[in-house]
Amino acid sequence: MAKPVIIPSVDDFSPISSDRVSVVIQGPILRERVGDRPTTQECLRSVRTYLPEAEVILSTWDGSDTTDLAGIDKLITSPDPGPIWNYVKLRDNNVNRMIRSTNRGLALATREYCLKFRTDLCLTSDRICRIDTSAERSAPYSLFSLPVTTTSYYVRDPSVIPMIFHPSDIVQFGRTCDLVDFWNQPQVDPHWLVRARPILSIFGRYAGFTPMRVVPEQVVTLQWLARHNIHVALQDTFDISFKAYRIWEQVLFRNFRLLDAVDSGVAFHARLRRKKFFTDRANFTETVFAKAGREQSLPHLWIRWARAALSKYVICFFYLRYYKRLWRTYRLYSAWVRQKK
């Protein structure tokens, strides 16, 4: 039986002063505000406001216009690896861009702690810069020296959305050596990630038709675990086999800590909040996360896994949203079939 993971209140985490922090801001340079999506200069200004003594590193692409950007200590540009094309949904998958720009920025970080941030976000406080220094680190699956703090956005609760190995990669705060460990990984092979023939999934509230084996968060997490000799082969994005689920719970509760996104001190723009269900209901909350960490007995684990299985195979059929998505899936499938003829 796994040992309980005691997760204290976020208010009991240790705040880290900005003079001990490097901030890696990664992504494209945004010169114009679109709706409530800030410019890169606004991002930099917010970081300087709330983390005044931090080492600020901007990691972007070769050829980007970085003139007149104020508040940068170090700038690094990289060749743009480009997106991986989803030929069914006709949109880009930017996992390789995220890996490269984050990894290159982290290579310049010299402080003990690091905040991984994006060029289209702003800070509203320094609350994200907190660490659970009381965490027990000798247990199996404790891969970081200290847990990495993230916001709750996109840390999927499998009892609602049956997805595992899905931590948040938008904002992360932890020891620099731990973030380097997480992001020090190769570029994803498009021929592996994109199937020659798409798969049709009719189970789960997130039913769909896609050629992608897994989503970016899962790719990055699985590659990180493989470097630690923890090998998990998900059949698809919504694979929730009991064995994989059990491993994920241990990895999640022993290596990550959550701040509820609305109280994290990070301003998420509407583009990241455009689907209210996926930001308000589909993710762990601080309270649910801490409770699950404490309840590590086998019966509790079975109950949580059973809820995830019910969500995938039964409960989805009782939501109108599921049928709307199923209709969109059918239209995607029909369009793909016509294209192949």
Regions found by a protein language model. Give the residues of each.
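Membrane-proximal basic amphipathic "stem/tether" segments
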Residues: 1-9, 271-341
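Short loop->beta transition adjacent to catalytic acidic/histidine clusters or analogous donor-positioning motifs
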Residues: 19-21, 48-58, 73
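A conserved hydrophobic helix/loop-capping motif in glycosyltransferases and polysaccharide synthases
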Residues: 21-34
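Short, well-formed alpha-helical segments that are part of the catalytic scaffolds
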Residues: 31-50
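Active-site-proximal specificity loops/subdomain of glycosyltransferases
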Residues: 59-108
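Short aromatic/hydrophobic "clamp" motif used to bind/position activated sugar donors
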Residues: 114
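Active-site acidic Asp-centered loop
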Residues: 117-118
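Catalytic core and acceptor-binding pocket of nucleotide-sugar-dependent glycosyltransferases
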Residues: 123-129, 135-287
